[in-house]
Amino acid sequence: ITDGWLSSEAQGRRSIYRYSESGAKRDRLAQPRVYQNANDLWDGEWHVVVANNWSSDPELYAQYVRDLMWSGFGKISENVFIRPRVSDKSVCCCRELAESISPTSICFTAETARCVSQEPLVDLIKRTWDLDTIKSRYEVFIDRYEPLLAAVWKNPRLPGAQAFAIRLFMMHDFRRIRLVDPMLPPALLPDSWSGDQAFYVAHELYDLLIPSSEQYVMEYMQG
């Protein structure tokens, strides 16, 4: 609720929680980032958004910035945002991001010149996205859940409540990292990137926990 993801409604002594309007929008943006891995080839093209922040309400502009970040954009100046163009190129980024950018923003594509040194590009990546911190968070995730994955492989028939709890906390931890990971294509990532291994651990553990945890949820809902 504090972060604006949920809204609550009192019904007697109970409180009913559901996605807020902004929370539902953020969840739609997050879905492909959480459940898909970035393995696209990149040909040097970028999406660029230039925001007219001087004509926007500050609170609304802050929300636009957060939504752009959750869509993989990095901030290279106060009102200019970029991300590698690796999705369906038949879809205009303005149409894809209709809910995320200000109506007064300008969206276009650009291309990295191949005749210049790659050093400025490497420096730009480092200044735009904090990949070292994200990599460290992935490594913490792997250290925490890889042993669990090995244990569940040996004994996949966990009690339903235990399987549900592990699945819930694991996906919560993984989602928090994916929301700040720009999902850059491999060509722009540092060596020994830990995101792929973290995705593998999360994907495998999730699949192993599905049968027991889903059965537990169905039994709980049926009373």
Give the role of each language-model region.
Residues 22-47:
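Short, amphipathic alpha-helical interaction segments positioned at domain boundaries
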Residues 41-50, 74-79:
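Glycine-rich, often proline-containing surface loops adjacent to acidic residues and nearby aromatics
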